[in-house]
From Swiss-Prot:
This is Imidazole glycerol phosphate synthase subunit HisH. One of its GO terms (biological process) is L-histidine biosynthetic process. Its EC number is 4.3.2.10, 3.5.1.2. Heterodimer of HisH and HisF. It comes from Pseudomonas fluorescens (strain ATCC BAA-477 / NRRL B-23932 / Pf-5). It is found in: Cytoplasm. GO terms for molecular function: glutaminase activity; imidazoleglycerol-phosphate synthase activity; lyase activity. The keyword Signal does not apply. Residues 3-212 form the Glutamine amidotransferase type-1 domain.
Amino acid sequence: MQTVAVIDYGMGNLHSVAKALEHVGAGKVLITSDASVIREADRVVFPGVGAIRDCMAEIRRLGFDALVREVSQDRPFLGICVGMQALLDHSEENEGVDCIGLFPGQVKFFGKGLIEDGEHLKVPHMGWNEVKQAVDHPLWHNIADLARFYFVHSYYINAGNTRQVVGSGHYGVDFAAALADGSRFAVQFHPEKSHTHGLQLLQNFAAWDGRW
């Protein structure tokens, strides 16, 4: 049976993610902060919630920045929400925080005064929104273009390499909702909270060989 390591650095919605992975038959799901267990896993999931400064402080304290760079090179790897944002170069949250730098780009604040069709939009962006699929990636298998996923975020990703944007969203501004590079895939939305489409994405991840 394959193993899926859900990285625990104290800042993620870990049990919801693990339960969703178990629900789709992903194999043996381990919530762990043990580097050796993470290295031995067949697949790795990197969730995250909260302030990026606190997340990156814990990631660096545990040495997980180097570990994430290592394990995401040679096996299917999924970043979720702030776990996705931590993979970028830099976030302007908390007066500016350097991140892991696996994907080029910046994490930016939606800002006050966000307007769409004459209406003021609330920040954080919270609720269901469409994701426009840019390419035919294996993790989109059996998920229709413009399927709706569940988002909760005040900061959005401005990708530095548009070829890595495999899904985009719009909330006053266009933003990267999904990024991919080799065996790495990352999403701004919460698949574990996104019902049918989110579970399908996790099922696709569980079956993916990491090639694209």
